[in-house]
Amino acid sequence: MARTPERRVRTLDFAQFCHGEPSSSHGFCRELVDCLRSLGFVKIRNHGISGEEIEKVFVMNKLFFSLPQAAKAKAAHPPEANPHRGYSYVGQEKLSRVKDYEKGKRSIVDVYDIKESYDQGPAVDKLYPNRWPDKQDIPGFRVVMEKFYERCHQVHQDVLRAIATGFDLSPSFLTDLCCENTSELRLNHYPGVHPSSLRKGAKRISEHTDFGTVTLLFQDSVGGLEIEDQNSPGTYFPVSSERKSDMIVNVGDCIQRWTNDKILSTSHRVVLPEDRDALIKDRYSVAYFGKPSRSQLVSPLREFVKEGEKPKYSAISAWQYNQEKLVLTYGGDEEILVPKPSSSVCTGVGQLQ
């Protein structure tokens, strides 16, 4: 797949939305939607999460993945898709299997992803409790992670309000679809490797789209993140961060489905450096994956389907959609069980049946 260095992801100031005058706030929302429509990605500064908070979670990121394998395995993700919590070793996930999911295709070739990860949900989730490492192995880990999760949850809600406002909808239009908190926070570590040890076709993460609403990403300066140019399918260009506090926001599949492709979930990947003469450095990132309520449908909403236009997606719950992709990612054929809706699950807004 080709690469092009010409394109750039725009950077917006979130303070305009949170603290600006009404005209400035609304202008930000329109520009945000324009960025997401054109690239599916945007960088945001002054988002409300301090540099100190971000640095703390990166410290915990490095500490966790530097633990002995036996210590990380105490919080192990199961071999199958569920519960999607805890530590996944290098090669356990295979995102190449879900690359063409929306096209009704399933990849028969597994691409080896060179990363390990740790997944966490909300502090209270009766269906999927979090899996924590032992306190004595990494003191303070749980406190830092739970606090950072809550900070990201707040920003996720604000971003959804800004997107809705940019479409001239009620600010709560999208947050009403996410009233049950099921989002996930992930630590990623891409181990340093010597080029001679790499498998053919290996990537740090294969081409994929994110499953949920929007993703909030923080990354170090090592580089490697690339996104697909929507005007030139198959062509990717790099997205770097000048500092860890830069928050990269990208649209997930659920927003694409709700808007009937008015905003697209852009394919992205993490590649290895082209110059492989020396040891390839470790890379670290932190991602918050916003998710809808589990019982919420992720089919097109009437607010985004013009008269005479057909919905492009059939009705499916956010839960089932997420599970189908997870089962492919972890390589299992387990049955997808739909949970009973909790009393807090919202009923949906303007859903086309």
UniProtKB/Swiss-Prot annotation:
Protein species of origin: Metarhizium rileyi (strain RCEF 4871) (Nomuraea rileyi)
Residues reported to bind Fe cation: H208, D210, H268
Annotated pathway: Secondary metabolite biosynthesis
UniProt xrefs under Pfam families: 2OG-FeII_Oxy, DIOX_N
Enzyme class, UniProt record, top EC level: oxidoreductase
InterPro entries linked: DIOX_N, IPNS-like_FE2OG_OXY, IPNS-like_sf, Iron_ascorbate_oxido_reductase, Oxoglu/Fe-dep_dioxygenase_dom
Iron keyword on record: yes
Function, as annotated: 2-oxoglutarate-Fe(II) type oxidoreductase; part of the gene cluster that mediates the biosynthesis of pyrrolopyrazines, secondary metabolites showing insecticidal activity. Within the pathway, ppzD converts L-proline into trans-4-hydroxy-L-proline as a major product, yielding a key precursor for peramine biosynthesis. PpzD is also able to convert L-proline into trans-3-hydroxy-L-proline.
Binding site for 2-oxoglutarate: R283
Catalytic activity: L-proline + 2-oxoglutarate + O2 = trans-4-hydroxy-L-proline + succinate + CO2; L-proline + 2-oxoglutarate + O2 = trans-3-hydroxy-L-proline + succinate + CO2; D-proline + 2-oxoglutarate + O2 = cis-4-hydroxy-D-proline + succinate + CO2
Protein's recorded name: 2-oxoglutarate-Fe(II) type oxidoreductase ppzD
EC number: 1.14.11.-, 1.14.11.57
GO molecular function, one term: dioxygenase activity
Gene Ontology biological process terms, A to Z: small molecule biosynthetic process
UniProt keyword 4Fe-4S, yes or no: no
Cofactor(s) annotated in UniProt: Fe(2+)
Domain Fe2OG dioxygenase span(s) in chain numbering: 181-292
The family this protein is said to belong to: Belongs to the iron/ascorbate-dependent oxidoreductase family.
Protein origin, superkingdom: Eukaryota
Cofactor: how and how many bound: Binds 1 Fe(2+) ion per subunit.
Keywords: Dioxygenase, Iron, Metal-binding, Oxidoreductase
